[in-house]
Amino acid sequence: MGHALCVCSRGTVIIDNKRYLFIQKLGEGGFSYVDLVEGLHDGHFYALKRILCHEQQDREEAQREADMHRLFNHPNILRLVAYCLRERGAKHEAWLLLPFFKRGTLWNEIERLKDKGNFLTEDQILWLLLGICRGLEAIHAKGYAHRDLKPTNILLGDEGQPVLMDLGSMNQACIHVEGSRQALTLQDWAAQRCTISYRAPELFSVQSHCVIDERTDVWSLGCVLYAMMFGEGPYDMVFQKGDSVALAVQNQLSIPQSPRHSSALRQLLNSMMTVDPHQRPHIPLLLSQLEALQPPAPGQHTTQI
């Protein structure tokens, strides 16, 4: 584990014997803050995620998030630059130093286009989808599931390549639920950690004897694909109106007709949004179908976003 030292008077912090200059705040969540910092040793920008740890469990979860990052060396999964635990009296902060992506998230891109009355092209969608699937394939191959895939958790690199972030909700891919108590525990966990409008149907009402597997990510991927196609998630408006998302996801999704999209893309989306998880495809099958559609290679002008 690295060591952190705050040098507040100079607006710098030291992590693993390297000094970083605070530039500005990037955002904040319930118990975390993200700052833009510059490495004074290399001139590169980084995102410093600071997680407030009130209890031992918080520290363990932050450590686990760092461990999840360290499992992967993959172009479509966010890498961890450094991790440390900072202590100030009874207060603890877990610091995750991450690469900074100036283009922001996939959601930022969807919103930017929507503001101009535009959408991602099908070629762009296919290329992005391929990268997201490859990231998920790597996660699933290690025996884990992401569990909180959504457009705001997908960064865009300099060439527009998708990079999966926020690994704090990751857990084992295959969960054998045996009994009502375990089912309720998992359901409560999902309510806290899996964004409601991207949450798979099987996580809203967990059965007392069932298997929850990595295909919860495939449902979420379908919601991401829908957002890329139509500028909003399939259940965003349901949630915003205050209607029941849990009820809405129990019915097969009706996909709007659009001349922008091929029947093959619509069929792909339809398969991801299969309510019965046992009938939902795994990522390797989706990858083979995507590769058969032959999206343009990275760097070709049609894929640039």
Swiss-Prot record:
Positions with a binding annotation for ATP: L26, G27, E28, G29, G30, F31, S32, Y33, V34, K49
SUPFAM superfamilies linked: Protein kinase-like (PK-like)
Keyword Kinase on entry: yes
Disulphide linkage map: none
Subunit note: Monomer. Interacts with DRG1 (via its N-terminal); the interaction phosphorylates DRG1.
Protein name: Serine/threonine-protein kinase 16
Protein family according to the UniProt entry: Belongs to the protein kinase superfamily. Ser/Thr protein kinase family.
Catalytic activity: L-seryl-[protein] + ATP = O-phospho-L-seryl-[protein] + ADP + H(+); L-threonyl-[protein] + ATP = O-phospho-L-threonyl-[protein] + ADP + H(+); L-tyrosyl-[protein] + ATP = O-phospho-L-tyrosyl-[protein] + ADP + H(+)
